[in-house]
Amino acid sequence: IMGKDRTEFDPIVIAGGPCATFNPEPFADFIDAFIIGEGEGLVSHVLDIIRDGKLEGLDRHAILRQLADVSGVYVPSLYVPIYNEDGEFKGYDIVEGVPKTIKRHFEMLTSGGETVVATNYTEFGAMYIIEVARGCGRHCRFCMAGYCFRVPRVRPLDILKEGVERAEKLGKKVGLMGAAI
């Protein structure tokens, strides 16, 4: 169901991740709100806004309007594309009060970034994955990490050590993960 066809009884559809951050427009007609950038720190806030809005009796548009005020959230229905007569993209008709630019949300890497479900029934079942770093400063033209998540950030050593200790308690090998390691 396209976003414009959803009713008050339909869920608010949210998307995120690298593809949504890099180019959300191919999905804009189907998604109510995109989390642009890294979503771990935004998801609970976004869900709180939706829950609180529903509890207050706000309609779908009012909730989406509140989401648009969150830095790192893009609500496509509030940015209507405008085209020239020849079909060339001209710009957007932006709802008043909505940010003209959507800024990517970056995490400081102080929590999360580890295996959540530790089971042997997955591809890396014997391993406890720990994210060491995000972003990349090399800016290779072929790589999404260099453009989409440009700012290189390294998780603090004490947090990495805590992750290794959790892996040891579970009897798992440690796998280190990052875009540029």
Report residues per predicted region:
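Context-gated lysine
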Residues: K4, K54, K90, K100-K103, ...
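N-terminal start-of-chain detector that recognizes signal peptides
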Residues: D5-F9, L47, K100-H105, T115, ...
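N-terminal [4Fe-4S]-dependent radical SAM core
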Residues: P76, I82-I129
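Radical SAM [4Fe-4S] cluster-binding motif and immediate context
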Residues: T110-I181
